[in-house]
Amino acid sequence: MKEVVYVLLLVLLVSVSDANETKPNIENFLRCLRNRTNPKNPIAEAIYTHENSTFASSYVSYTNNKRCLNPNDTKLIAIVAAKHESHVQATVVCAKSNGIQIRIRSGGHDYEGLSFTSSVPFVILDMHDLRSITIDVFRKQAWVDAGATMGELYTKIAAASKTLAFAGGVCPTLGAGGHISGGGYGNLIRKYGISVDHVVDARIVDVNGNILTGATLGRDLLWAIRGGGGASFGVILSWKINLVDVPKTVTVFKVNKTLEQGVTDVLYKWQLVSSKLPQDLFLRAMPKPVNGVVPSEKTIAVVFYAQFLGSARRLMAIMNKNLPELGLKREDCYEMSWINTTTFWQNYPVGTSTSVLLDRPSGPAGAFYKSKSDYVKKPIPKEEMEKIWKAMLKFNNMWMQWNPYGGVMDKIPADATAFPHRKGNLFKIQYFALWTDANATYANLGLMRDIYHEMEPYVSSNPREAFLNYRDIDVGSNPSGETNLEEAKIYGSKYFLGNFKRLMEVKAKYDPENFFRFEQSIPPASAM
């Protein structure tokens, strides 16, 4: 009996000790933040804890996937909405010294919520207030802070020049920090490549709280954060980017065709020609289930979106020669400036003011979603497409985006940056399912895995490649506080192919103790 009482007392003492250890860590962390920052740049107003009435709203404001939200997460210690670079430095140093993990959030477009969730004690380092943009028209360059959105960047570029642009994504609310570090895919890809192909310098806070840039950054680290994801190596503060030339007149179109209108034949032909078209032309195909002629019956429609760096007359000639099956008409085409195409890609009516590019999220995410990705090396047989359509028709709301490669992407070596998906790809697929009822989550996740399995014979293999910016936990993951090298090799080989080993070597040099880690981070080579 005495032994039982002793054991119970011991358990109680350990429990009390654990509870008391957690609280001092929080207090020590907050005290450290105040001590590590200059009073001229006070950090107090940047810190949100569970005691703040605005804590929950701060947490959800920059998270766009309701599936990943957990406002009552007891592991979340604080949110630091940095307003000065020194706040970032202090957060890194203080989190490390107190054994607290960091999640870095810029635009909140993390498809699996890895930038704002964790199963171990953590803080969110929110970058959205660091949003300065400086344009140098003469040098055709810009500095853009990690918290600036792509819409803000595009607006600033257009205000400075009508014939300059940046090769980035079409979504205006993407944060520059995460979007660029994961690759940065957009509709200028065939002409100019992806975002990381135009990064020439960066400012990054390392594991010791130092700001590395220029000569101190190191060519190996600059290589790694261009496509390897910055959050494995430090905190991206800003990027120095090269801008690209665009003509004063750019032409866009959007054409829909259904199964009943023979879209399967058109899409098969699209596979044969889309990566071989002139590199000034980007022609996306977007299959999705829609209501048929009879409302109770669904069919498949494919929306063909195009952007051409030139006139409608030249575009019509190219399309009539290469894809007459689409039946493009002159009235389908709209000529406009490059900046105005950015609203077109967001499905705004033609002529919508580009001021919408400056809109930022003001509340919690309204929908749940799941995304996956694939790379296609050879055309999917026409007779096999029926299987794909059947799998898609099981969803209430999903679509694919078939994004063409070719052009300059065939000329950039796979190891030029950490982003490896270059020559040999016809197109990249994004799968996207959207729903609003939490009770439908299980079913939709199952359907996404089903269609991903259905597509296996038609996509890359050994490994089955994946795009880092379309974060997908299904391709492999580690627990928040651990790093299993064998598991890391699984997702690392899919995201980075032959570049994964070099990424681990860079990681070992700049973060040997693996402080910057999360479920799909890059482990140091020393873990081998």
Curated annotation (Swiss-Prot):
Name the Gene3D superfamilies for this protein.
3.30.465.10, 3.40.462.20, Uridine Diphospho-n-acetylenolpyruvylglucosamine Reductase, domain 2
Q: Where is the signal peptide?
A: 1-19
Q: Which Pfam families match?
A: BBE, FAD_binding_4
FAD-binding PCMH-type domain location: 69-246
Q: What's a Gene Ontology MF term here?
A: oxidoreductase activity
Entry's InterPro entries?
A: BBE, FAD-bd_PCMH, FAD-bd_PCMH-like_sf, FAD-bd_PCMH_sub1, FAD-bd_PCMH_sub2, Oxid_FAD_bind_N
- The keyword Secreted is assigned to this record: yes
Q: Give the keywords, sorted.
A: Cell wall, Disulfide bond, FAD, Flavoprotein, Glycoprotein, Nucleotide-binding, Oxidoreductase, Secreted, Signal
EC number(s) from the headed UniProt entry: 1.1.1.-
User: What's the main place this protein lives?
Assistant: secreted
Note whether Cytoplasm occurs among the keywords: no
Q: Please describe the post-translational modifications of this protein.
A: The FAD cofactor is bound via a bicovalent 6-S-cysteinyl, 8alpha-N1-histidyl FAD linkage.
Record note on cofactor: Binds 1 FAD per subunit in a bicovalent manner.
Carbohydrate attachment sites?
Answer: 20, 35, 52, 72, 256, 340, 439
Q: Which GO terms describe its cellular component?
A: extracellular region; plant-type cell wall
Residues joined by cross-link 6-(S-cysteinyl)-8alpha-(pros-histidyl)-FAD (His-Cys): 109-171
- Compartments reported by the entry: Secreted, Cell wall
What highest taxon heads this organism's lineage? Eukaryota
Name the cofactor(s) required for activity, per the record: FAD
| Disulfide cysteine pairs (residue numbers) | 32-94
Q: Which family does it belong to?
A: Belongs to the oxygen-dependent FAD-linked oxidoreductase family.
> What name does the UniProt record give this protein?
Berberine bridge enzyme-like 17
